[in-house]
């Protein structure tokens, strides 16, 4: 419980560091840390196969992209997080919002956000003579392509547009 809570806080703080990046080098490091923490959260909830696949695919692709863009956008004196008041303001605002959300969850026990998927009997079920078992990895992939196929299409399109934007920026 507390490990997942700590990983969730690290994930949000990683995203805050990405949003307030002063230099492309720090943005890439923030994405790598956030990706690793997100995969740790997936593995903590029992999705060991899914966490490993996301870790390998995400970090494999992102390391290539950020290695290339960092090499093309190297600065002699990169701006750090402490060199600008606006960057400190964004970081402190993000940390403040995170502390507010933690206090809210401690006080009220959560946000009540969630989606209940019905009809899981058509998804990946491993059956034997004694009964059936639904694995979290298979259920997550099946729900992504069954109930949330629009999300997969939007994610693919966003990644394609992101690659085009990165190529245009560094050209």
Curated annotation (Swiss-Prot):
Its EC number is 7.1.1.2. Gene3D superfamilies: NADH-ubiquinone/plastoquinone oxidoreductase chain 6, subunit NuoJ (1.20.120.1200). GO terms for molecular function: NADH dehydrogenase (ubiquinone) activity. GO terms for biological process: mitochondrial electron transport, NADH to ubiquinone; mitochondrial respiratory chain complex I assembly. It catalyses: a ubiquinone + NADH + 5 H(+)(in) = a ubiquinol + NAD(+) + 4 H(+)(out). The keyword Electron transport applies. GO terms for cellular component: mitochondrial inner membrane. It comes from the Eukaryota. Its main location: mitochondrion. The chain crosses the membrane at residues 1-21, 25-44, 49-71, 85-105, 150-170. It is a multi-pass membrane protein. InterPro entries: ComplexI_Subunit6, NADH_UbQ/plastoQ_OxRdtase_su6, Nuo/plastoQ_OxRdtase_6_NuoJ. Belongs to the complex I subunit 6 family. Core subunit of the mitochondrial membrane respiratory chain NADH dehydrogenase (Complex I) which catalyzes electron transfer from NADH through the respiratory chain, using ubiquinone as an electron acceptor. Essential for the catalytic activity and assembly of complex I. This is NADH-ubiquinone oxidoreductase chain 6. It comes from Lemur catta. The gene is MT-ND6.
């Amino acid at each position: 419980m507390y490990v997942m809570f700590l990983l969730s806080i690290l994930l949000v703080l990683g995203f805050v560091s990405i949003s307030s990046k002063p230099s492309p080098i720090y943005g890439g490091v923030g994405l790598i840390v956030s990706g690793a923490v997100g995969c740790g959260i997936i593995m903590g909830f029992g999705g060991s196969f899914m966490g490993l696949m996301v870790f390998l695919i995400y970090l494999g692709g992102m390391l290539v992209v950020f290695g290339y863009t960092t090499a093309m956008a190297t600065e002699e004196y990169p701006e750090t997080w402490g060199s600008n008041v606006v960057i400190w303001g964004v970081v402190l605002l993000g940390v403040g919002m995170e502390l507010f959300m933690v206090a809210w969850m401690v006080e009220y026990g959560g946000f009540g956000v969630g989606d209940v998927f019905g009809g899981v009997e058509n998804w990946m079920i491993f059956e034997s003579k004694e009964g059936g078992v639904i694995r979290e990895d298979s259920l997550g992939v099946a729900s992504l392509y069954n109930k949330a196929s629009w999300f997969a299409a939007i994610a693919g399109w966003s990644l394609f547009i992101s690659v085009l934007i990165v190529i245009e920026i560094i050209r």
